Curated annotation (Swiss-Prot):
CDD domains: DTBS. InterPro entries: DTB_synth_BioD, P-loop_NTPase. The gene is bioD. ATP binds at D12, C13, G14, K15, T16, F17, D50, E110, G111, A112, G113, N170, C171. It catalyses: (7R,8S)-7,8-diammoniononanoate + CO2 + ATP = (4R,5S)-dethiobiotin + ADP + phosphate + 3 H(+). It comes from Legionella pneumophila subsp. pneumophila (strain Philadelphia 1 / ATCC 33152 / DSM 7513). This is ATP-dependent dethiobiotin synthetase BioD.
Amino acid sequence: MKRYFVTGTDTDCGKTFVTNQLVNYFSDSAAIKPIASGCEYSENQLVNSDALLHQQQNHLPMEIVNPWRFRLPVSPHLSAREDGASIDVHKVADYCLNLQVNDIKKLFIEGAGGLMVPLNEQDTWLDFLKLTRIPVILVVGMKLGCINHTLLSQEVLEINKIKCQGWIANCLDQDMLMLDENISTLEAKLNYPLLARTNYGGKISDICLSSL
């Protein structure tokens, strides 16, 4: 089974939406969100709204889709601490590397926030990637400032020799000035391909998804 880690340039760049679109596109795929904060109680269990979308799409138990759940809508290390817990990055890595789902050939693993979001006092998602070496799909929320955020993300990945499979332009605002020019700038400056584009909450537009 191929595994991909879906991360983003920042919070609210559209990782969950894009991940759902990828699962819709690939009929032999599923998605999980191993760590989520901002969970609320529903039917006597903590539920994260993003993870719930994956669970409803995959028809998998929530315990498989989202095993690490915390209440406060803050960085995972802070939310876990407030719940009297801590996140062991090695356990998260083992879980994501060893999870098997029947008839699934592609597993999309959605992170929380960006690459440098802390999971505990020492480790970030980058440390998770160093342990797992799972290829990255970078979701770029197309808005003012995205070029800077995207190039910084590329630098972090390259310095740490983490493979990036490609990036997806998630067009958040149909009125964004010079949207196509911004995408062209990123295509010229990034060292990995533009896989797809999503337009204002619409379906994913295939550009190079066959490489996955």
